[in-house]
Amino acid sequence: GIVFKEPEIDLSKMKEWKNNIIGGLTGGLSGLAKQRGVDVIHGTAKFSSKNEIEVNHESDSRRISSDQFIIAVGSEPAELSFLPDDPRIIDSTGALEPDQIPSDILIIGGGIIGLEMATIYSALGSEVTIVELTKQLMPETDPDLVRPLERILNKKCKKIMKSSQVISAIASDEGISVSFKKDDEEFSEIFQNVL
């Protein structure tokens, strides 16, 4: 007979796969820009006129003139001042480099990135709770588009709390104790990780 073992997730192979995908996408965009004759310049820029920008990068500063500019600003994870400094509190960058899969995770924010992370961690086996300040997930999106996604997430996630606010978080040996406020009610829960 044949005996199959319980499937396991190899986090190091998963990270390697993710890094290969990111490297391919980044390299592909750089190659496409070069192929189209686009000069890619890194730094902090500001327009000095409609056809000129001043770019600062490290100790270098220069002015560039052009009829057209493509501004690719990228993004940085938001830092929430009420969260304690604790390695179990991660941002979206750290969430893609896990050392272990948490048994449960609170995701603060029901925007696109938060929902991507909820889907990933749910698929990895974590119990996922999402908290969103507004009455709708992905608040800037047409509600008719959000409803089908929310139905799927309700099946995959432990809990989705909308119109709810995180008011504090305290790190302890047990986990991260997070206090919430919904309407006039306050309550707390403990999570292994918070994103």
Which residues are covered by each model-predicted region?
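Short hydrophobic/aromatic-rich motifs at helix boundaries and adjacent loops
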Residues: 1-4, 90-91, 120-123
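Short polybasic/polar patches that bind polyanions
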Residues: 5, 34, 71, 122, ...
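FAD-binding core/adjacent interface of flavoenzyme oxidoreductases
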Residues: 23-108, 165, 179-195
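Residue-level detector of short coil/turn "hinge" positions at structural boundaries
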Residues: 4, 40, 159-160
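Rossmann-like dinucleotide-binding cores of NAD(P)H-dependent redox enzymes
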Residues: 16, 20-30, 96-97, 102-106, ...
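Short, flexible micro-motifs
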Residues: 4, 46, 75-77, 112-117
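Glycine-centered loop/turn motif at secondary-structure junctions
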Residues: 1, 35-37, 125, 156-157
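Glycine-rich active-site loop/strand segments that organize a redox cofactor
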Residues: 1-17
